[in-house]
């Protein structure tokens, strides 16, 4: 079991903890598939809803909040039945807009894993307005059920009445609908190709600034992040922040980053290079490789 879970595992009922420990191996990064979840429910003799709430301390253990020191864990349950953990991330000494909220982390985890819809969000603190707006960008966002400890469950539409969302800006294919934009680039570099593929899968209906970041660690492992825009603009999730959240979930340190690539569209209304460099330089003493590509 990873050291970061030693304290949180003691907060779980013993039967659930005993069943969960084998899953918390060195490669565990917060994903539990539907079959594994069913086995946890059976072994613990708890309901699924009880298990999901009980797992929140495990999700919160993924957090890296050096500024607030407030650990938030979130669990997104997909239509597939799989669950995806996420946690808040803050960059020490940097402006707060670089922060990743736990719900954003969990949703990006699900998106990068190929999930097509979120049906439940379990979180240990009431979603802030920023996260409510971010969730509203998703497929059937208003119908996502929000579950909090010691509170009744409600739909997102309860927490965000009279919501402004993608349809108000004539966007009919919201976040998590698989969409692919093709770009022209002649490269044999696997890391650049990976970034190009993820840029094509990014979500930028408001600026067409399709973009992705890939980070590489010294052992050759890569961690990606895609741009995810929001109808309200400010809650958009930048690809570098998503990549850093991804890396952190996998229990890697920022000091292990040896290479960083940003690929973005030449036809976007904005460029993410400045914000991407700011975030990168806050955590690693390396230069960003910036590649601009043309849509096919």
UniProtKB/Swiss-Prot annotation:
- Coiled-coil parts of chain: none
Give this protein's Gene Ontology molecular function annotations: cytidine deaminase activity; identical protein binding; zinc ion binding
Q: Name one GO cellular component term.
A: cytosol
> What is catalysed by this protein?
cytidine + H2O + H(+) = uridine + NH4(+); 2'-deoxycytidine + H2O + H(+) = 2'-deoxyuridine + NH4(+)
Instruction: Give its E.C. classification number.
Output: 3.5.4.5
Q: Which residues participate directly in catalysis?
A: 103 (proton donor)
InterPro entries per the UniProt record, alphabetical: APOBEC/CMP_deaminase_Zn-bd, CMP_dCMP_dom, Cyd/dCyd_deaminase_Zn-bd, Cyt/Deoxycyt_deaminase, Cytidine_deaminase-like, Cytidine_deaminase_bacteria
Per UniProt, where does substrate bind? Answer: 88-90
**Any idea where the CMP/dCMP-type deaminase domain is?**
47-167, 186-296
**Co-factor binding details:** Binds 1 zinc ion.
Binding-site list for Zn(2+): 101, 128, 131
Query: Which cofactors?
Result: Zn(2+)
- The answer to keyword Zinc applying to this record is yes
* Gene Ontology biological process terms in this record: cytidine deamination
For this UniProt record, give its keywords in alphabetical order, as a comma-separated list: Hydrolase, Metal-binding, Zinc
Family matches, as Pfam families: dCMP_cyt_deam_1, dCMP_cyt_deam_2
What subunit structure does UniProt give?
Homodimer.
> Which PANTHER family did the record assign?
CYTIDINE DEAMINASE
What this protein is reported to do is described as: This enzyme scavenges exogenous and endogenous cytidine and 2'-deoxycytidine for UMP synthesis.
Please give the family membership noted in the entry.
Answer: Belongs to the cytidine and deoxycytidylate deaminase family.
Name it. Cytidine deaminase
Which species is listed as the source?
Shewanella sp. (strain ANA-3)
């Amino acid at each position: 079991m990873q050291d970061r879970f030693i304290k949180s595992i003691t907060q779980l009922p013993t039967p659930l903890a005993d069943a969960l420990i084998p899953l918390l191996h060195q490669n565990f990064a917060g994903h539990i598939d539907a079959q594994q979840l069913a086995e946890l429910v059976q072994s613990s003799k708890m309901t699924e809803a009880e298990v999901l709430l009980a797992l929140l301390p495990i999700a919160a253990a993924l957090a890296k909040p050096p500024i607030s020191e407030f650990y938030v864990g979130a669990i997104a349950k997909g239509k597939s039945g799989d669950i995806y953990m996420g946690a808040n991330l803050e960059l020490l000494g940097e402006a707060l807009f670089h922060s990743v909220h736990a719900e954003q982390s969990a949703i990006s985890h699900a998106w990068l894993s190929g999930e097509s819809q979120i049906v439940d969000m379990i979180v240990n603190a009431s979603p802030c307005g920023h996260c409510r707006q971010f969730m509203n960008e998703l497929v059937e966002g208003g119908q996502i059920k929000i579950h909090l400890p010691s509170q009744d469950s409600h739909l997102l539409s309860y927490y965000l009445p009279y919501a402004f969302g993608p349809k108000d800006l004539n966007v009919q294919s919201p976040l998590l609908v698989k969409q692919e934009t093709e770009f022209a680039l002649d490269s044999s570099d696997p890391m650049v190709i990976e970034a190009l593929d993820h840029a094509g899968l990014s979500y930028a209906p408001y600026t067409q600034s399709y973009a992705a970041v890939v980070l590489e660690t010294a052992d050759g492992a890569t961690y990606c992040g895609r741009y995810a825009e929001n109808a309200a603009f400010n809650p958009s999730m930048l690809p570098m922040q998503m990549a850093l959240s991804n890396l952190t979930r996998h229990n890697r340190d920022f000091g292990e980053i040896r290479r960083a690539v940003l690929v973005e569209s030449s036809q976007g209304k904005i460029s993410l290079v400045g914000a991407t460099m700011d975030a990168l330089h806050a955590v690693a003493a390396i230069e960003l490789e910036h590649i601009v590509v043309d849509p096919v």
